[in-house]
């Protein structure tokens, strides 16, 4: 009988490490902020990095929507990485850590 972890042995997991070199793009739209950064993540037991663009858009009701776009191509599923990036961006925004 296979143990539960044996079922996931072949799945490659991408783990978020950090966002670095965050730079804000100048914009004349007050409710939309666009940033560029380097995301560092762990994949196959080594650190890799890619360029990303993320946007924080404030709605009229005060909600904030975050979108993430990878500027470099990726050849593997990155849903968990995108979710982690969005969580980090929201955390930085709340704490005032974005430029």
Predicted features along the sequence, with ranges:
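Short beta-strand segments that buttress and anchor functional surface loops
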Residues: 37-42
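Acidic, low-complexity intrinsically disordered segments
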Residues: 2-5, 15, 23, 49-99
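Short, solvent-exposed beta-strand/turn "edge" segments of beta-rich domains on protein surfaces
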Residues: 23-32, 43-45
């Amino acid at each position: 009988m296979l143990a539960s972890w044996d079922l996931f042995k072949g799945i490659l997991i991408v783990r978020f490490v950090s966002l670095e070199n965050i730079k804000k793009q100048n914009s004349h739209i007050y409710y939309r902020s666009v940033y560029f950064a380097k995301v560092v993540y762990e994949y196959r037991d080594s650190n890799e990095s890619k360029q990303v663009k993320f946007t924080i858009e404030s709605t009229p009701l005060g909600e904030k929507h975050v979108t993430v776009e990878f500027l470099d191509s990726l050849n593997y599923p990155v849903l968990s990485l995108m979710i982690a990036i969005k969580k980090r961006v929201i955390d930085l925004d709340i704490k005032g850590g974005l430029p």
